[in-house]
Amino acid sequence: MLDQLTLCLLLNFLCANVLANTSVFNPCVSQNELSEYEAHQVMENWPVPPIDRAYKCFLTCVLLDLGLIDERGNVQIDKYMKSGVVDWQWVAIELVTCRIEFSDERDLCELSYGIFNCFKDVKLAAEKYVSISNAK
């Protein structure tokens, strides 16, 4: 199993950067900041695709407000782990796999939505696998 330092180094090496807060585009300029409770409610009720671009940008702003991503689209692994959304046992490989899937994406809204939607799908698949394994 990877330790936290190895995971951080691996993720930093594999993760590309995307500029969110440029003079050309900032997806959160017109968004009101949500309370922490409201932001967590949005995360718990993650929408099912297809999602329009405006909602992807809204979700990006929620992720930024919660500190789960930075303005370049990098996942803040420590905050993500503390959020309780993911389990350390499988997170390293899945985070890298999802990040690689969107490595060419330069649009912050598409990038952050894509990565976190991938995380959600992987987490649901893992939970389903565990429930099936426990039922046997």
UniProtKB/Swiss-Prot annotation:
The keyword Transport applies. It holds the Pfam family PBP_GOBP. Changing D121N: In strain: KY02106G9. One of its GO terms (molecular function) is odorant binding. One of its GO terms (biological process) is sensory perception of smell. Changing Y129N: In strain: KY02106G9, MEL6G59 and KSA2. Disulfide bonds join C28-C61, C57-C109, C98-C118. InterPro entries: PBP/GOBP, PBP_GOBP_sf. SMART domains: PhBP (SM00708). One of its GO terms (cellular component) is extracellular space. The keyword Nucleus does not apply. Keywords: Disulfide bond, Olfaction, Sensory transduction, Signal, Transport. SUPFAM superfamilies: Insect pheromone/odorant-binding proteins. PANTHER family: GENERAL ODORANT-BINDING PROTEIN 57C-RELATED (PTHR11857:SF48), ODORANT BINDING PROTEIN-RELATED (PTHR11857). Belongs to the PBP/GOBP family. Present in the aqueous fluid surrounding olfactory sensory dendrites and are thought to aid in the capture and transport of hydrophobic odorants into and through this fluid. This is General odorant-binding protein 57e. It comes from Drosophila melanogaster (Fruit fly). The lineage of its organism: Eukaryota, Metazoa, Ecdysozoa, Arthropoda, Hexapoda. The gene is Obp57e.
